[in-house]
Amino acid sequence: MSRVSQARNLGKYFLLIDNMLVVLGFFVVFPLVSIRFVDQMGWAAVMVGIALGLRQFIQQGLGIFGGAIADRFGAKPMIVTGMLMRAAGFATMGIAHEPWLLWFSCLLSGLGGTLFDPPRSALVVKLMPQQRGRFFSLLMMQDSAGAVIGALLGSWLLQYDFRLVCATGAVLFVLCAAFNAWLLPAWKLSTIRTPVREGMTRVMRDKRFVTYVLTLAGYYMLAVQVMLMLPIMVNDVAGAPSAVKWMYAIEACLSLTLLYPIARWSEKHFRLEHRLMAGLLIMSLSMMPVGMVSGLQQLFTLICLFYIGSIIAEPARETLSASLADARARGSYMGFSRLGLAIGGTIGYIGGGWLFDLGKSAHQPELPWMMLGIIGIFTFLALGWQFSQKRAARRLLERDA
């Protein structure tokens, strides 16, 4: 085995261990934020939506800057610093008794994510030149298992004190920072040492990539509801916060049994864009009836459909984003690819929280879910138009040649 192949093989296992620590640290805390502050402390859902949206927007919206800096200085210092900032954000969240302090904790958490997320994604692109889609599927399976373990641990700790929940998340991110500081080599992310401004400019001039990323905002408006409206809905229907962990258990079971087989089968028979659109359509249609159900079994059935759509769409979305990235500025591209999540996540959290409160006060609980479903359908149509334009341009070039 060549030294390059050996480094990539070891890097794969490093990425899997690192990813598990990050997922555990995140899911111990964030699925319970809406339960803690809306259900236990009686805050309006929009207040918590602002906090979650702020974290999402800062982490993903500023990702291009984190990625561009990592292109210039390397992955290691950015990852270690970002994880320590995330730990500080969780520690602050544990003592939040006013909205501004919750918002500040999410600000710190988001800034940490801005620093560590793009270089981690770029390392996957760098180390997995072949079978990248399958590795993204493995990471998603790991995400699902880690989400359940984290949510179970967080739910158990919440019975005693929310500060224990946040302290556990903070400790896990400190451990992750130490793991990276100790074992992560000083790898460069890009094929050349790209100046910060040049990397950002290269992305902004790539109109096809920019349009694709911004269109995905609609996809993310639906996807982020697993952190806000779906846990609140499960809690309302079940009458107990402990039921939320079963929502993540469903995701884990589906991911561990279906994600990798579906990814392997579909990559042989369908284009990436078709897989993304099919998954998005299933997610959109499963959202629409959520506000009309009154039983936990019906709700979990719709959540199953939503997760199946995500299982189909997410590996294709991640692989498509990576395949469109320029190797000369990987960090910048992977950072900018998070902008759709920043915009869609922020609107999804704040708008979703506002619509949830509005629907509740107007006795129209189906309102936010129908709106999200319609947004998903429009995003599906927009992506279909983009992909058809790309195929038409390719056929024109082939004909001219």
From Swiss-Prot:
For this UniProt entry, the molecular function terms from Gene Ontology, in alphabetical order, are: transmembrane transporter activity
Q: Where in the cell is it found?
A: Cell inner membrane
A Pfam family annotated for this UniProt entry: MFS_1
Transmembrane ranges?
Answer: 13-33, 99-116, 138-158, 164-184, 213-233, 243-263, 276-296, 299-319, 339-359, 367-387
Signal peptide range equals: none
Presence of keyword Transmembrane: yes
Per the UniProt topology annotation, the Cytoplasmic ranges are: 1-12, 117-137, 185-212, 264-275, 320-338, 388-401
Report the superkingdom from the record.
Bacteria
Entries under PANTHER family matching the protein:
MULTIDRUG RESISTANCE PROTEIN MDTH (PTHR23517:SF2), RESISTANCE PROTEIN MDTM, PUTATIVE-RELATED-RELATED (PTHR23517)
What is the protein name for this chain? Multidrug resistance protein MdtH
Q: Which organism is it from?
A: Shigella dysenteriae serotype 1 (strain Sd197)
Upper lineage ranks? Bacteria, Pseudomonadati, Pseudomonadota, Gammaproteobacteria, Enterobacterales
Q: Which gene encodes it?
A: mdtH
